[in-house]
């Protein structure tokens, strides 16, 4: 029976069937002796039939058990395959080919396994980033060749240039990175993305240590840091709003997304305002473009009051100037109200906030919703005299001024005509000042301190510079031009182009015989004298090369005057020569000379020393009581006068020159006596 069970179980081969057919006669031999074989023949057949029935039942049971075992094995194999594919998908590895199944596996299950393999291949293909379209440019050659694309596709999503995206962080506990796609490159078969990074406040380091605290959970810091990452690290797109500091932040429900109001300097580790105008030209254009895109997407945002503007949390210094004091109402201390203008609005007027020209500003509809802007408009309007104010002042003039005007007559008419020329119509003044304030607010409105400083500077220069005020009112200067002018240019009332084109005024310099240290030319003059405690210092300037330096008084030996090219020679006139002599003596010993001496005194003083010297020489060389003849004395006087044109000579040298002359006359006198 054991052999027959084994035969029924292994019925898959034809050779086994042949062997099994030959085996039954061997096992069918009777075990009893031959003597009793004939009697028990029918009984044996009955027993064999019963045994065969039992064996058939057992074989059926065994076959059913075997089929159950096979089905269970197949289920286990399918579960193992599915688990393996799941783990491979999570790890991102390519799945292995399915193990070949036996011939007994049904065709339906084979088809299902083929479909699963195709899906796995599709999923594997979708995990790789693929560029879209042709490359926009190619850089490098050979192995270093790089292809640049405008977009790429990854996991069914398409990403383009300038798209803000989230990137996979390095650590699982970190938040996703945020960047703007600036370039898409393919190198050596792999696709990479160049991103310009954003920083979260808790990720940005301070210069002195630590991190910044976020004013909003959505806040990010913009930066100019650029780095390359694999294209597969891109998760999905996001929205970033660039909001100036003077605008209110939109609500999270209406406009979800990140908020950027600061720029993080990764090198200096400092923060800058988004709307500062101190960036480089290309970076400034980039920031302005991002702000413009935000405004086009979400619309115009309402202004934020300066007191609500968050202070700069940079580590540069504590911003004490940002704490503005509440302005106090001006107190009127005048005894009478006769000289007041009729346009001055009372403090109890609603909405005026003590503006002097509130009625004019309201009439021409230039008032803004911001109080501080209206105050600056009122101050600018107060710098220009208005024709209506002039008439009002004349109507409310006091009797004393009227009496003075009647007594002066024509002089009063002249002054009134000058005032009328300098006064302007209110509509002209209001339009110009409103344009000036608006241009200042558009450029510096995000920073209240810079706006306040610029308005104070403009108000001061317009009030104190008649040239600037006249040119501005005559529309020779546009209001936006005043924002680019320096304090010196505002004071002169000239633009940079006009100031450079203006010819320089010729200067008269006291020239010296010193030599320039740079060009070694003898064209050095004194441009300035600095009076110090121990001695005067002289600032010398070379006319040839423009080099300037400081020197002591000892370095100056002689002085001349550098006259303009159009004038004549200054040293030819006798009085000018006398003045130069005085200057020489003053420079030689400035403390010995009196302050105010006319030129005639200097001439007499220069000629006086020669006379007593001649008398001393006469008395010293006089052998007899005879005096020198008149012609000799006249020659000596003319000789000393002619020396005025020469440089200053010490007195000892004059004595030596005048000493030999009386000696030349002594032999002639003695010879006359002998004769």
From Swiss-Prot:
PROSITE patterns: BAH, TFIIS_CENTRAL
Keywords from the UniProt entry: Nucleus
CDD domains on file: BAH_plant_3
Annotated spans, Disordered: 1-143, 300-349, 493-512, 587-675
Location of the TFIIS central domain: 372-518
Knockout consequences: Precocious accumulation of VRN1 associated with reduced levels of the repressive chromatin modification H3K27me3 at VRN1 locus (similar to vernalized cv. Bd21-3 plants), thus leading to vernalization mimick and VRN1-dependent rapid flowering without cold exposure in daylengths longer than 12 hours. Global transcriptome equivalent to vernalized plants.
Residue spans of biased composition, Acidic residues class: 48-70, 113-127
GO BP annotation list: DNA-templated transcription; negative regulation of gene expression, epigenetic; negative regulation of transcription elongation by RNA polymerase II; positive regulation of vernalization response; regulation of photoperiodism, flowering
Identification of the protein by name: Protein REPRESSOR OF VERNALIZATION 1
């Amino acid at each position: 029976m054991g052999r027959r069970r084994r035969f029924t179980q292994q019925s898959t081969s034809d050779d086994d069937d042949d062997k099994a057919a030959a085996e039954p006669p061997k096992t069918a031999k009777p075990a009893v002796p031959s003597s009793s074989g004939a009697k028990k023949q029918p009984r044996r057949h009955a027993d064999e039939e019963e045994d065969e029935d039992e064996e058939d039942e057992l074989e059926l049971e065994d076959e059913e058990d075997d089929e159950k075992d096979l089905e269970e094995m197949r289920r286990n194999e399918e579960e193992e395959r599915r688990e393996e594919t799941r783990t491979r998908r999570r790890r991102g590895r390519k799945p292995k080919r399915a193990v070949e199944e036996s011939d007994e596996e049904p065709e339906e299950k084979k088809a299902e396994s083929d479909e699963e393999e195709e899906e796995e291949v599709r999923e594997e293909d979708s995990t790789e980033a693929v560029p879209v379209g042709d490359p926009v440019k190619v850089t490098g050659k050979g192995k270093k060749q790089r292809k640049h694309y405008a977009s790429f596709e990854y996991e069914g999503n398409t990403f383009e240039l300038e798209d803000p995206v989230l990137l996979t962080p390095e650590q699982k506990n970190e938040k996703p990175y945020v960047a703007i796609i600036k370039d898409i490159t393919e190198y050596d078969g792999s696709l990479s993305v160049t991103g310009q990074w954003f920083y979260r406040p808790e990720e940005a380091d301070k210069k002195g240590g630590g991190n910044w605290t976020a004013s909003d959970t959505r806040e990010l810091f913009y930066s100019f840091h650029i780095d390359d990452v694999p294209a597969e690290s891109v998760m999905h797109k996001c929205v970033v709003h660039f909001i100036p500091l003077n605008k209110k932040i939109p609500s999270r429900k209406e406009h979800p997304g990140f908020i950027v109001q600061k720029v993080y300097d990764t090198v200096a580790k400092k923060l800058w305002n988004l709307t500062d105008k101190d960036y480089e030209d290309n970076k400034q254009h980039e920031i302005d473009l991002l702000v413009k895109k935000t405004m086009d997407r979400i619309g115009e945002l309402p202004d934020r009051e300066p007191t609500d503007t968050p202070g700069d949390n940079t580590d540069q210094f504590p911003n004490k100037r940002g704490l503005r004091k509440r302005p106090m109402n001006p107190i009127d201390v005048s005894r009478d109200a006769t000289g007041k203008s009729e346009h001055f609005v009372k403090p109890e007027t609603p909405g005026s906030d003590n503006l002097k020209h509130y009625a004019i500003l309201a009439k021409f509809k230039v008032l803004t919703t911001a109080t501080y802007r209206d105050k600056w408009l009122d101050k600018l309007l107060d710098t220009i005299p208005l024709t209506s104010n002039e008439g009002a002042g004349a109507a409310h003039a006091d009797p004393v001024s009227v009496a003075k005007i009647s007594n002066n007559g024509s002089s009063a008419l002249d002054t009134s005509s000058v005032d009328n020329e300098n006064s302007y119509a209110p509509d002209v003044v209001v339009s110009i000042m409103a344009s000036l304030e608006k241009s200042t607010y558009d450029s510096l409105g995000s920073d209240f301190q810079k706006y306040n400083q610029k308005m104070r500077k403009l108000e001061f220069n317009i009030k104190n510079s008649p040239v600037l005020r006249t040119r501005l009112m005559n529309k020779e200067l546009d209001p936006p031009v005043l924002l680019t002018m320096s304090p010196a240019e505002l004071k002169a009332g000239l633009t940079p182009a006009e100031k450079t084109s203006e010819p320089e005024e010729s200067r008269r310099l006291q020239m010296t015989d010193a030599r320039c240290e740079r060009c070694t030319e003898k064209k050095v003059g004194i441009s300035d004298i600095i009076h110090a405690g121990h001695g005067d210092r002289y600032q010398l300037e070379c006319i040839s090369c423009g080099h300037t330096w400081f020197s002591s008084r000892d370095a100056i030996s002689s002085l001349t005057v550098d006259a303009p090219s159009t004038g004549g020679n200054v040293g030819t006139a006798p009085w000018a020569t006398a003045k130069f002599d005085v200057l020489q003596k003053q420079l030689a010993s400035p403390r010995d000379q009196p302050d105010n001496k006319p030129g005639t005194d200097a001439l007499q003083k220069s000629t006086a020393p020669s006379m007593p010297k001649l008398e001393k020489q006469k008395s010293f060389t006089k052998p007899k009581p005879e005096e020198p003849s008149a012609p000799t004395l006249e020659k000596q006087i003319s000789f000393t006068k002619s020396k005025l044109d020469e440089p200053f000579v010490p007195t000892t040298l004059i004595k030596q020159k005048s000493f030999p002359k009386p000696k030349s006359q002594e032999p002639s006198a003695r010879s006359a006596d002998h004769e």
